[in-house]
Design a protein with these regions (language model features):
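Iron-sulfur (Fe-S) cluster-binding modules
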Residues: 108-118
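Accessory C-terminal segments flanking Radical SAM cores
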Residues: 1-108
Length: 118
């Protein structure tokens, strides 16, 4: 295995351990990026920050199919803060996205990958 394959395998292992700890109500990773780097757009036009949260930020049909007023609105900003400070869910996509944008997890993944190759 090459370095990239090893690092990706380590990332998957770290991701699984984070999810397992979150499932046990042990907040391991705060700072979720749901609603900041990702969003959900339903077939009805509802814009949501996350698939798990029962929160609708607005409907794209009400803004002439323009996302910006919803994305930059007060409700979206409020939920971003709430998610970043209090969310530690088990939704793999959000865990993975958050890992990619937090140096702590990038360094941990790289360190474990390099250690595996030694």
């Amino acid at each position: 295995n090459g370095l990239l394959e090893t690092i990706l395998a380590e990332r998957a292992g770290i991701e699984r351990s984070i999810i397992a700890e979150h499932y046990q109500k042990k907040p391991t990773m705060l700072g979720c990026q749901a609603g900041t780097l990702t969003m959900i757009l339903s077939e009805e036009g509802d814009v949501r920050p996350c698939e798990i949260l029962d929160v609708v930020l607005g409907n794209i049909r009400d803004t002439n199919y323009t996302l910006e007023p919803i994305w930059r609105g007060n409700l979206a900003q409020q939920h971003r803060k709430e998610i970043a400070n209090n969310c530690f869910c088990t939704f793999e996509t959000c865990v993975r996205t958050t890992m990619v944008f937090q140096p702590k997890w990038i360094l941990k993944t790289l360190r474990k990958g390099v250690d595996q190759l030694r």
